């Protein structure tokens, strides 16, 4: 019984990469074709796989309820928080996590650095959704250009670069960097920012900050189910 389950799991994992035929699956698993075919027919009965027009098997809609159950249990705040601490400790910048709520964005998590700023952000602080570095990310992925002060070329550049840096945008003596956090289906889930004194955001330091933010932002996204 256990061996059959292990064989079935192996076949499903192979199908994650795309459709495969019985012979291809048999070769990849070193299983007899009859065994592979029997397992596929069992999966097909549960709508976990389907036989497509190219005469190959692919994952089907039956796997979605299982995935959805897992994905709905994911808490971006809980997943991001330890990485936010790591970013704060490495870069000595305050780290913030924002969610979109209608016409606003709200800070749902913050890890503060020992660099107090005027108008410092607190958990629960609400801002207009399209303002600031985080707002530009939300505007790029969620906004109608008619509702933002962003151009189509700016949005295109942000999608290409994967980050935003602003200096003195919301607070005159502060600067910020924002990166998107994606979830299942590569849907924008949240925006993570760092913020600090504007003097910290020299060209050299921005490169250092960007390397860390992009790497850990993508790590959080992958744990949220994104396929980047």
Residues of each region from the PLM?
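N-terminal helix-turn-helix
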Residues: 1-74, 218, 222, 226
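Amphipathic alpha-helical effector-binding/dimerization core
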Residues: 58-146
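Juxtadomain coupling helices with adjacent low-complexity linkers
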Residues: 90, 145-161, 172-173, 190-228
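Sensor-regulatory modules in signal-transduction proteins
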Residues: 181-184
């Amino acid at each position: 019984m256990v061996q059959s389950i292990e064989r079935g799991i192996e076949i499903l994992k192979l199908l994650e990469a795309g459709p495969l035929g019985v012979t291809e699956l048999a070769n990849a698993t070193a299983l007899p074709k009859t065994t592979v075919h029997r397992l596929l027919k069992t999966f097909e009965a549960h709508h976990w796989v389907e036989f497509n027009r190219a005469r190959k098997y692919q994952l089907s809609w039956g796997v979605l309820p299982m995935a959805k159950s897992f994905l709905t249990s994911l808490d971006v705040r809980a997943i991001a928080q330890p990485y936010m601490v790591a970013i704060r400790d490495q870069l000595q910048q305050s780290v913030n996590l924002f969610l979109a709520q209608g016409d606003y964005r709200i800070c749902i998590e913050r890890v503060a650095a020992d660099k107090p700023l005027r108008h410092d952000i607190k958990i629960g602080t609400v801002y207009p959704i399209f303002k600031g570095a985080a707002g530009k990310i939300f505007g790029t992925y969620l906004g109608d250009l008619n509702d933002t002060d962003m151009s189509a070329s700016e949005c295109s550049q942000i999608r290409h670069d994967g980050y935003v840096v602003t200096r003195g945008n919301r607070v005159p003596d502060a600067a910020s960097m924002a990166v998107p956090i994606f979830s299942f289906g590569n849907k924008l889930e949240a925006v993570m920012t760092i913020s600090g004194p504007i003097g910290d955001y020299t060209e050299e330091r921005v490169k250092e900050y960007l390397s860390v933010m992009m790497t850990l932002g993508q790590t959080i996204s992958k744990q949220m189910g994104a396929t980047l």
